[in-house]
């Protein structure tokens, strides 16, 4: 979910007032085709703007399905820092015969790592929620009514990111 937070909406008028940035942006768009596909141009409110974001619109929509899924990240109190799916299916990584795992661990940690704090392994963590809300506001400001998502996932209720 963290890549969702790397987003900014820049009015084209602002870009034009920054000739060095505009020159680099034009070079980037002309030469970095794979990465440039993540830059969207459109209207933000009443003014032409550019959306600079890590996920493309298609990836954003896929990520939002997980973010807004109550079986995954969305909870009655905020967004979990790790999907609840990992409660029954821990993430396991094998590196040269050594096994590493991350469990969904709400509340007190089952290990002494990081002082026993398990905030980054499941429960709602204020810093992540703050960053996600700010990012979703930016996406919502850029896409407006042109992007609707099901909230919560599976409910059939469609809404904009501004709602």
PLM regions: where:
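Acidic, mature catalytic/reactive cores of soluble proteins
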Residues: 1-163
């Amino acid at each position: 979910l963290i890549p969702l937070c790397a987003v900014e909406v820049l009015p084209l008028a602002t870009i034009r007032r920054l000739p060095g940035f505009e020159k680099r942006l034009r070079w980037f768009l002309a030469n970095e085709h794979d990465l440039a596909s993540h830059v969207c141009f459109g209207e933000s409110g009443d003014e032409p703007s550019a959306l600079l974001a890590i996920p493309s619109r298609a990836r954003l929509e896929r990520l939002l399905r997980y973010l807004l899924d109550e079986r995954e990240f969305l909870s009655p109190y905020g967004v979990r820092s790790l999907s609840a799916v990992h409660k029954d299916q821990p993430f396991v990584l094998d590196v040269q015969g050594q096994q590493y795992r991350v469990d969904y661990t709400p509340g007190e940690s089952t290990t002494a790592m990081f002082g026993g704090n398990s905030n980054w392994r499941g429960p709602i963590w204020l810093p992540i929620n703050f960053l996600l809300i700010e990012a979703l506001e930016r996406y919502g400001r850029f896409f407006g009514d042109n992007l609707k998502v099901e909230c919560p996932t599976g409910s059939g209720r469609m809404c904009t990111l501004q709602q």
